[in-house]
Each structure stands twice: as structure tokens, then as C-alpha cells.
Amino acid sequence: MTRTYENFQYLENKVKVQGFKNGPLPLQSLLQRLCSGPCHLLLSLGLGLLLLVIICVVGFQNSKFQRDLVTLRTDFSNFTSNTVAEIQALTSQGSSLEETIASLKAEVEGFKQERQAGVSELQEHTTQKAHLGHCPHCPSVCVPVHSEMLLRVQQLVQDLKKLTCQVATLNNNASTEGTCCPVNWVEHQDSCYWFSHSGMSWAEAEKYCQLKNAHLVVINSREEQNFVQKYLGSAYTWMGLSDPEGAWKWVDGTDYATGFQNWKPGQPDDWQGHGLGGGEDCAHFHPDGRWNDDVCQRPYHWVCEAGLGQTSQESH
């Protein structure tokens, strides 16, 4: 072993001596000497690994690009579908609005004709009353007819005014807001009322009214109670009165204790035997108009109320 090492040392020294004699080795020859054997193999492996990394990076970027492209295509498709749906909805709404305007115009013309007929009939009765002023039986016959005709003409004038306002509102994009109620709302004493034909919980009904810039109806007087009662029908109907914290409160802040009340006998009783959990914290109208407390989750009809000009001009 010692002999072999000495021979290797001898050869190495000989190469160095020859190198110094012959001058520095060329760069290419030096690289070949340095990269021969295992070094050359490692360099090849390194280059192969680098190439593999580059291929992986390019493949990953291409895959990400493909996913982004699919996402963009999906988003564009959804956007196109939504846009088409919105255009169709707007077109349908425009057609419905045109039909509503046409219907209201027809009603206005009908009311104008009916009003004119009523005025003519009233004038005729007035003339007859003047001619028969000396008839002893005329007051008992003519006066009731005259009064009835006068009330009829006054009602026709009011209805015509409302319809004319609604047509102007629809034609002028709600520029007459504040002068009349929206279509399908009922005007009474400077307020607008909307009566539902389906059922919701008390909270859902109140939210619905709020979306129309209104609230569940608040009863302030016997006169308002009688007005609302005429439109109730046979269904239980929510009003804007509840006591979730143990004290009855109106949704608009009206004082409950000193205000008008119309409870059924023995109500409110906060009955808890219904099996639905909790008590009865929301008030509703019976078909006869009297009030009762019940579970707020029951799907009852409801009435929205708002000041004149505060409601949404959207038709229901």
C-alpha cells in the first residue's frame, strides 16, 4: 500500500513538473480534467435536474393558466346568463308597466264618463226640484235622491283624482311622489295601506313592509280601525303591535298605554299551551276586527301602512 502511494505521488509530481515546463494547461483541457469521471456525471445530473425543474414550473404555470381560463369562461357565462335574465325581467316589467298604465287610463276615461253622467243626472234632479218646488210631496222624494247623487259624484271625483295621479306617477317616473298612493295601495286620511293576500310570520311581514318604506299597520283611532276592518276579509291579519320584551309596543313608537285598543275579551293572555315554545308576543286582527295575541311565527296575512308619499312607487 505504501509503495502504491509513493508511485502516485511520483506521478503527480512528474505531471506538475511537466506542466511547469510546458506552460499552463489550456482552459478546455483543464475543464476536461476537472470534469472527468464522477464530476462529469454530477454535472449531467445537475443539468437534468434543472431541466426537470423548468419543465415542472412551466407545466404548473400552464395548468394554472388553464384553470384561470376555465374560471374566466365560467364567470363570463354566468355574467351573460345573469345579464340576459335581468334584461328579460326588465322587459317583462316594462310590459307589465305599460299594461298597468293602459288599464289605469281606461279606468280614468271610464270614471270621466261616469262622472259626466252623474253631473248631468244631478243637474236634471236639481232642475226637477226647482220646477216641483211647490209640490207637497217633493221634499220626501227628491231630497234623498239628490243627496245620493251628490255623494256619488263626490266619490267619482275622488276616485278620478287618485287614478289620474297614479297614471301621472307611472308616466313621469314617480315625479308626482307625495300626492297619491302607489298602484294597489288604498289611500285614507293622508296614509297609504296595502293588504296582503298571502301569509308570513310577523317578523317577515314587518320586513316586507320596511322594504316598501312602510311598516305594519298602527291603529290610532276607532275610525282607522273601521277603515282597516272593511278590507280584512276572513283571514287572521298581523298588525304592528308586539311585546317581545314583556311590554306591548307599536312599531312606529306610538304610545300603547294611552292609545286606541280593541282586544277580544280576555286578551291578550300570552297563552303558552300551543306547543310551539314561548308565549304569544304578536298581535293580529280577527276577521271581525278585534285583536288577539298569538305566536309570532304563524303565517298570517298582514297590512302595511305609510304616510302619503313615503311608500315605494312600485306596483304590487
Swiss-Prot record:
Binding site for a glycoprotein: 267, 269, 280, 286, 292
GO cellular component: early endosome membrane; external side of plasma membrane; lysosomal membrane; plasma membrane
Motif extent (Endocytosis signal): 5-8
Residue numbers binding Ca(2+) 3: 243, 270, 280-281
Cysteines paired by S-S bonds: 181-192, 209-304, 282-296
Bilayer disposition of the protein: Single-pass type II membrane protein
Annotated GO MF terms: carbohydrate binding; D-mannose binding; fucose binding; pattern recognition receptor activity
Assembly and oligomerization: Interacts with A-, B- and C-domain containing PTPRC/CD45 isoforms: isoform 1/CD45ABC, isoform 3/CD45AB, isoform 5/CD45BC and isoform 7/CD45B. Does not interact with PTPRC/CD45 isoform 2/CD45RO, a memory T cell marker.
Protein name: C-type lectin domain family 10 member A
Primary gene name: CLEC10A
